[in-house]
Amino acid sequence: WLAVLVLIPTVMVFDAIRRKSGTDAKPKTAAEKKKLLAAGFVCGTLLFAASAAQQIGITINPSTAKAGFLTAMYVVLVPVFGLFLGRKGSAQLWVSMVVAVLGLYLLCMKNGFGSIESSDWLLLSCAVLFSFQIIAVDHFSPQVDGVRLSLAEFLVVSVESTVAALLFETPSAAQFAENAL
């Protein structure tokens, strides 16, 4: 929620600056508003799902080194998924992929393939979801205002996270107040 609270005045400041320069980034038509809401929903839901998978994976197996490496696989996965969208890959991409997969093997396969833990799968799914989120932002950002997209995205993450917390945890009002700042 903190990001939402920061982005609201940021949008207002950017709007004021743009008005002075004679431009306006506000969505004017219903179609533009719908596109912004859809972009915020898609990007926000992917970000929420990736963050949730990461947090659950770390809860199951709190090896931060492994979690960091598996999560960082999104750096390799984004260009790989980009290949499916018609983007070209360089030789460096393929070398990086091989090195990353070797590192993944050394980190996760201590006792053969069966040694992959459920937390590893969650953290790999986190990397995939972060990759999709980055690709979604790349897709939508030329179509909508970036600051408004960030606001919509973080609003979706905040709402979905709050709903998940209420469904799967038993937070007290004091905990909400304590974590609000």
Question: Which residues fall in each region the model found?
Answer:
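Juxtamembrane helix-entry segments on the extracytoplasmic side of multipass membrane proteins
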Residues: 1, 31-36, 94, 109-129, ...
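Juxtamembrane helix-loop-helix junctions in multi-pass membrane proteins
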Residues: 1-4, 25-28, 58-66, 132-157, ...
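Transmembrane alpha-helical segments that form core, pore/gating elements
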Residues: 7-12, 78-79, 84, 115-171
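Hydrophobic transmembrane alpha-helices of multi-pass small-molecule transport proteins
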Residues: 8, 89-109, 126, 130, ...
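C-terminal transmembrane-helix exit sites in multi-pass transporters
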Residues: 11, 15, 74-95
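Specific transmembrane alpha-helical segments of multi-pass solute transporters/efflux pumps
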Residues: 16-20, 25-65, 70, 106
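Cytoplasmic-side transmembrane-helix entry/capping segments in multi-pass membrane proteins
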Residues: 35-42, 89-101, 120-123, 144-154
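Hydrophobic/small/kink-forming positions within alpha-helical transmembrane segments
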Residues: 44, 48-52, 75-80, 105, ...
